[in-house]
């Protein structure tokens, strides 16, 4: 069950689809509906995805979701309960290629973010970010289903040595945990 590969495949599909190219959707605002409809079809690709978002760097105050085009501050505050918009935007803008992070104000969410190069110019940074919003509870249930370990016994979730979730809310390294029958220590993909 390689959820990371599924998310990567979606990012690759978006990157090559003409709907998402700035030259295309800027021709007519109705073309923005094609972006929204296309994003909606990807939501069901993975059981982990709660929301799928597209954020263009050239339009830093807006994003596209699987439901609509929305103001970034309004979406973050109303849907994800994130009020520190600039902090979130800075987290995004620090990403090159791919990263997973937990927003400071939303420890119950994991954001898988792919930087997309949509203009075809390969020697520059990306034009947009594709974000998958994954609730920690949904990821824990997924891990429980695969591993058989009850989600309440999962102390922390790591991906490639990066802490994505900790029950205590504090940062720990894997070496600080004692391996026992209540904890899964594993490496690899989601």
Question: Would you name each region that the model predicts?
Answer:
Residues 10-11, 15, 64-67, 168:
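Extracytoplasmic/secretory soluble proteins
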Residues 1-23:
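Juxtamembrane extracytoplasmic/periplasmic/luminal helical "stalk" adjacent to the first N-terminal
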Residues 5, 9-10, 25-26, 33-39:
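Intrinsically disordered, low-complexity terminal regulatory regions
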Residues 34-46, 118-165:
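Solvent-exposed, extracytoplasmic
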Residues 11, 54-58, 159:
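A general secondary-structure junction signal
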Residues 7, 50-54, 153-157:
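Short, hydrophobic-rich beta-strand element in sensory/regulatory alpha-beta domains
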Residues 29-39, 68-104, 139, 148-152, ...:
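Extracytoplasmic/periplasmic sensor domains and loops in membrane signaling proteins
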Residues 43-133:
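Extracytoplasmic/periplasmic ligand-binding sensor regions of membrane-associated signaling proteins
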């Amino acid at each position: 069950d390689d959820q990371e590969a599924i998310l990567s495949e979606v990012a690759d599909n978006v990157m090559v689809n003409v709907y998402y190219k700035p030259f295309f959707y800027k021709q007519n605002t109705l073309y923005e509906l094609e972006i929204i409809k296309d994003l909606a079809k990807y939501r069901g690709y993975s059981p982990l995805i709660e929301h799928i978002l597209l954020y263009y760097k050239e339009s830093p105050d807006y994003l596209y979701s699987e439901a609509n085009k929305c103001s970034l501050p309004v979406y973050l505050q109303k849907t994800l309960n994130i009020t520190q918009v600039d902090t979130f935007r800075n987290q995004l803008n620090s990403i090159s290629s791919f990263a997973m992070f937990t927003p400071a104000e939303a420890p119950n969410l994991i954001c898988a973010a792919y930087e997309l190069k949509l203009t075809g110019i390969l020697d520059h940074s990306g034009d947009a970010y594709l974000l998958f919003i994954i609730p920690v509870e949904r990821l824990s249930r997924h891990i429980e289903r695969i591993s058989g370990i009850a989600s309440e016994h999962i102390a922390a979730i790591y991906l490639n040595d990066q802490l994505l979730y900790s029950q205590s809310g504090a940062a720990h390294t894997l070496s600080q945990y004692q391996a026992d029958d209540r904890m899964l220590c594993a490496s690899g993909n989601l």
